[in-house]
Structures are given as structure tokens and as C-alpha cells.
């Protein structure tokens, strides 16, 4: 299976952690004015500001409005620049997440989401499925 859609990887079981609580819109005066940081094992990997995002929340809502929204829906806005997938092959080898790593995503006024990285075997109790081939690689 191949996919040119980067977000496809985020739709796999267990790949959308939320919580331990959800902050509602009335608790955030301006969602485009929040400091954001991502750390792996305490090392800052990404740091930016929600005002620098390439797509605004109203644009996201508009783009997906044909799907319809219901009370309780969660809007995922993506991440700030600096993801490992767009680094050099040497940097990717060092930066890609490995079992045992701890990820901390922090957004000002919302909190810190902290999650450990576990192997497929540890998380599911079965062997991992075949890997999806990277973009441009023949099947």
C-alpha cells in the first residue's frame, strides 16, 4: 500500500492520543495566539506559535464543512514546522521515534500531552504488519 498523503499515517489505530482532558473553545480567548512546543526525551524538536500555522482554524472548518460537525467533535490542526519527515536522511535516522522515547506536546493555556512510544509488538501483542513504502519507492 502506498500513500502520498502525509496525514494518512496519523489515521492508524492508537495514533491520535487525546487527553487527559479536552479544553473547550470558550477557554481559549484566541487560538491563533498560543505558544507550541514538542519535546522528545526532553529535547526540544519543534517550537513555534499557533499564529504561524499555514492554515487557520476558520479555513480548516470551511474546507471540511461538507462533512458536517456535531457536538463533541475534535478539530485536529496539524503541527508546527520541524517534523522529522522533511529532514535529510541522516537527520531522519536520528530523529524518527523509537520504542522507549517519550513525547511531550505542549500548548500554552492547554497543557502538556505526554506519551511513551512502544513497539507494535508491545502495544498489540502481535507481529507488526508490513510497512507502507515511502513515497516514490516502487512496490
How would you label these PLM feature ranges?
Residues 1-139:
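Catalytic-pocket segment enriched in acidic/His residues
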Amino acid at each position: 500500500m502506498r500513500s502520498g498523503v502525509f496525514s494518512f499515517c496519523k489515521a492508524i489505530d492508537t495514533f491520535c492520543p487525546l487527553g487527559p482532558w479536552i479544553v473547550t473553545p470558550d477557554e481559549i480567548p484566541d487560538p491563533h495566539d498560543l505558544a507550541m512546543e514538542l519535546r522528545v526525551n526532553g529535547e526540544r524538536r519543534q517550537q513555534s506559535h499557533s499564529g504561524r500555522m499555514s492554515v487557520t482554524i476558520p479555513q480548516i472548518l470551511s474546507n471540511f464543512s461538507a462533512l458536517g460537525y456535531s457536538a463533541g467533535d475534535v478539530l485536529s490542526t496539524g503541527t508546527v514546522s520541524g517534523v522529522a519527515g522533511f529532514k535529510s536522511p541522516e537527520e531522519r535516522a536520528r530523529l524518527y521515534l523509537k520504542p522507549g522515547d517519550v513525547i511531550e506536546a505542549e500548548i500554552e493555556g492547554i497543557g502538556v500531552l505526554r506519551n511513551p512510544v512502544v513497539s507494535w509488538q508491545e502495544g498489540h501483542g502481535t507481529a507488526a504488519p508490513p510497512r507502507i513504502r515511502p513515497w516514490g519507492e516502487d512496490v
